[in-house]
Curated annotation (Swiss-Prot):
This is Calmodulin-2/4. It comes from the Eukaryota. Keywords: Calcium, Metal-binding, Methylation, Repeat. Belongs to the calmodulin family. Expression of PCM4 very low in stolon tips, stems, roots, leaves and tubers. PCM2 not detected in the organs tested.
Length: 124
């Protein structure tokens, strides 16, 4: 259950980041509490929490929201969510997509606005 620099790189790139090998090593060293050169899940969560608190995370969240919000109306609909998840290789049923929307949809309007999106992203 440990994450290597290679695996961390894959995750970061899927989130739109492009870290160098040295940056990945630095990130691992930063949170590698037991010094074994890999990070376990608690260390990984610690790292992600730190990355999200960085000043540029606001811009990254806006960028991610724009990727989901295809028609740029300020909301992520079930169809838009399904489209992005399919592009990421996730085959979801309508029920699963609706469930994801319900979990994030604080005001109950059936879609996800930016504030709701940020809450979900920061809660992980």
């Amino acid at each position: 259950g440990c994450i290597t620099t290679k695996e961390l790189g894959t995750v970061m790139r899927s989130l739109g980041q492009n870290p160098t090998e040295a940056e990945l090593q630095d990130m691992i060293n930063e949170v590698d509490a037991d010094g074994n050169g890999t990070i376990d899940f608690p260390e990984f969560l610690n790292l992600m929490a730190r990355k999200m608190k960085d000043t540029d995370s606001e811009e990254e969240l806006k960028e991610a929201f724009r990727v989901f919000d295809k028609d740029q109306n300020g909301f992520i609909s079930a169809a838009e969510l399904r489209h992005v998840m399919t592009n990421l290789g996730e085959k979801l049923t309508d029920e699963e997509v609706d469930e994801m929307i319900r979990e994030a949809d604080v005001d109950g309007d059936g879609q996800i606005n930016y504030d709701e999106f940020v809450k979900v992203m920061m809660a992980k």
